[in-house]
Amino acid sequence: MSNAYEEYMRQMVIPMRQELVRSGFEELTTEEAVTEFMENTTGTTLVVVNSVCGCAAGLARPSAGQAVVRAEKQPDHLVTVFAGQDKDATAKMREYFGEIPPSSPSMALLKGKEVVHFIHRHEIEGATMDEIITNLEQAFEKNC
């Protein structure tokens, strides 16, 4: 049974989830969904580790959405997990990131199950939206 705080948080993050879904991202909300996706997907995947923090709202989510609209080459798949909300799904996805330390928000470009490009929170916080979009576009150009 959930408490009032958990219910409040579930309601509060709905727009934060929808922002990426509207941009074409599939939400993976359970450990099983992550495993199913990762074990049965080929090609390239952009994974956004979503977060409630300000840099996710002002930089990460809008940059990811714009990058997939603007880029000539794009990943085959777009998925997102929500750190702090869908804890099991996020932990499972991070297992596929290998030795890369947990970071949220963050973005990972995978070829199959291999991380070929990663943007950490500290790289998001210190950048402009255009810099993040360019970073992603260059990664897409090289890997997709």
From Swiss-Prot:
Disulphides: none
InterPro entries recorded for this chain? BrxB/BrxA
Q: What's one GO BP annotation on this UniProt entry? A: cell redox homeostasis
What's the family? Belongs to the bacilliredoxin family.
NCBIfam families, A to Z: YphP_YqiW
* Name under which the protein is recorded: Bacilliredoxin BA_2173/GBAA_2173/BAS2019
Which species is listed as the source?
Bacillus anthracis
